[in-house]
Amino acid sequence: MSESVHTNTSLWSKGMKAVIVAQFLSAFGDNALLFATLALLKAQFYPEWSQPILQMVFVGAYILLAPFVGQVADSFAKGRVMMFANGLKLLGAASICFGINPFLGYTLVGVGAAAYSPAKYGILGELTTGSKLVKANGLMEASAIAAILLGSVAGGVLADWHVLVALAACALAYGGAVVANIYIPKLAARPGQSWNLINMTRSFLNACTSLWCNGETRFSLVGTSLFWGAGVTLRFLLVLWVPVALGITDNATPTYLNAMVAIGIVVGAGAAAKLVTLETVSRCMPAGILIGVVVPIFSLQHELLPAYALLMLIGVLGGFFVVPLNALLQERGKKSVGAGNAIAVQNLGENSAMLLMLGIYSLAVMVGIPVVPIGIGFGALFALAITALWIWQRRH
């Protein structure tokens, strides 16, 4: 890995390109692996309510490791942290390929993802600064969503052909991400921090307190947590919605529908990069409310074309909503608790929201509530939550 103390802050520097490529391949593997593993669960006749449990063990790793991964990201060169994390993902995907319990293998991928996230976002503030940070976030989100688009579809299509081929493709993507990480320049870290677990937990709780007590960062944390909690729940809702509403039982169709959301988020992220700055973040809030309005309308559809269009609209609104909130947290968090710790706190909030929403969704499926009413109620509650957040933000 090349040694560098001073960074080229160009939006298209060599280091930024390496980060974007690594992010694409890593996110491609994450999304392909989800649908490949869901296909494996179906092939092995696991109950439907166990599907969200797969994601819950993944986000559980984020929550348990939250006090530690931020310091890891800040104490070592972030490119090396990303490389190690992608290596863990590779190991997890390979273990599922070789017949180890899919929940255990997916948990290992979750450990890698937990270590990866603070580094991948924290490095943006080191590779670029100021007005370019929102644009860099737009590039990162566009890369991630392009990977969601292609990875989700690849996972479903390959799983319809052969589940083992789909799992092997995921491992290959993670291997490519490890190689791309080699080309990220070695940036300055903050070594010398205590590695006592009690002290690290206390430090993390202090970072949580600092960010949650600040009005701007609390606003960002709540908004992104609600968005990603809702987003991951929607992915699983689609898996059950497709056969009920459309009468289609393959693995590929839910991935095509998820791809529509991904395309929309790319468009929305690009629009946010052009139209929203750190000083005008509140412009994104109406888009968040509209997500909750569109989801119930989507849930009532019975034809593919309207479903595609509405999911793309949900994606556009989502991209426009979440990118400015991410940038706000990174900018304010970098100055107060360090970029890595800020993202770790964000991950705790987002994954706690995911765990809660997935748990409620899994329980609803387990007790037999039909998927269409689940979708309607889910959208309505999301719209109310974002409306309440906007009202709170305007008053404070």
UniProtKB/Swiss-Prot annotation:
Molecular function in Gene Ontology: lysophospholipid:sodium symporter activity
Disulfide bonds: none
Topological domains, Periplasmic: 1-17, 74-90, 166, 247-255, 301-303, 364-365
Keyword Transport: yes
GO CC aspect terms: plasma membrane
Mode of membrane association: Multi-pass membrane protein
Keywords noted in UniProt: Cell inner membrane, Cell membrane, Lipid transport, Membrane, Transmembrane, Transmembrane helix, Transport
Gene3D superfamilies: MFS general substrate transporter like domains (1.20.1250.20)
Record topological domains on the Cytoplasmic side: 39-52, 112-144, 188-225, 277-279, 325-342, 387-396
Entry-linked InterPro entries: LysoPLipid__transptr_LplT, MFS, MFS_trans_sf
Organism superkingdom: Bacteria
Subcellular location: Cell inner membrane
SUPFAM superfamilies (alphabetical): MFS general substrate transporter
Keyword Cell membrane: yes
Transmembrane spans: 18-38, 53-73, 91-111, 145-165, 167-187, 226-246, 256-276, 280-300, 304-324, 343-363, 366-386
UniProt function note: Catalyzes the facilitated diffusion of 2-acyl-glycero-3-phosphoethanolamine (2-acyl-GPE) into the cell.
Entry's family note: Belongs to the major facilitator superfamily. LplT (TC 2.A.1.42) family.
Identification of the protein by name: Lysophospholipid transporter LplT
Species of origin: Shigella flexneri
